[in-house]
Amino acid sequence: MDLKSNIKLILATDLLAVLILSLFIKNFKMVLAFLLAVFVIWLFIDKNNINERLYENLLAMSVGFIEGILIFLGIIYNEVFLDITLGIFAILILIVMGILFPKYKLIFEVFDEFVEHLKQKSGFLTLISIFGMLLTIYVFLLILPSKEFCINAVDIIRTIMLVITANMFIIEFYTFKKFS
């Protein structure tokens, strides 16, 4: 299949996931919001020159979207799941900070290798996937009635999303500047 067909298959899979979730929690506003997002994406994929990068980014976002739906269902049916998820995020952040940046003065020396490693190991796509997952959880938590754990989770997820977005822009700007 060509790239356009692959992208349309990804969007169809995401739409199916949204329909199942909407039927499950009986909230059909999400389907309308997702159809609007699909319409905006469709404007990009109807062009003649679809590149591999757009396809990879959309695929990573789609994987994150489906992961977000699964985690959202876990949060609804088990509030302890949220605490476990936050604990895992905190441990991962500590591990990454401890391994990559053991001392603050080494950050600039490590940055070149860090960016190269991200590009080679599809780390950028991983960031996009995580961003899609967090965005999905964020939107679904806003739909829930205001509970204490939802408000705290929304604040934490918003912060993580801002950090990931800043990192993606830094990586893209850095590699664009380096190779241009």
Curated annotation (Swiss-Prot):
Keywords (A to Z) from UniProt: Cell membrane, Membrane, Transmembrane, Transmembrane helix
Residues spanning the membrane: 4-24, 25-45, 57-77, 81-101, 124-144, 156-176
GO cellular component: plasma membrane
Cell compartments where the protein resides: Cell membrane
Main location: membrane
UniProt membrane topology term: Multi-pass membrane protein
Top-rank lineage group of the source organism: Archaea
Record keyword Membrane present: yes
Protein name: Uncharacterized protein MJ0271
